[in-house]
Amino acid sequence: FEGFMDYLSFLTLRQESCPNYPELDGQDYIVLNSVSNVNKALYPLGNYERIHCFFDNDHAGLEALRQIRMEYGRERYLRDASQIYRGCKDLNEYLQKQIERKRQLQSAKGVRSQSPEKKNGFQL
């Protein structure tokens, strides 16, 4: 992950999407806190067959992904997970938009499901 907020966003999304998959708890995660630290992560990443990168959708994120690809080439499965949140700056922005969409849907359902209030008055 490029930043800690993206990691926390991932945990939130994972909990919502697949709360009953305990094998996900056995995975390791690296938070760079800046893509400028990607070189420091190259050695520890060498211990893994599969690497999933959750970098920002910007030039720096693409460059970090390129560096990891150059280091490991075809010997590792490398996934660019930023495709999941294409159109957003990062995973945290994607999560925020998902939450806002849910709020809008819930408020729209709430408005439609409420029947109009009856006025108190004289009835024959």
Model-derived features: where do they sit?
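Helix N-cap/beta->alpha junction signal
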Residues: 2-5, 57
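Short amphipathic alpha-helical face segments that pack within enzyme cores
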Residues: 5-12
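TOPRIM fold recognition
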Residues: 12-124
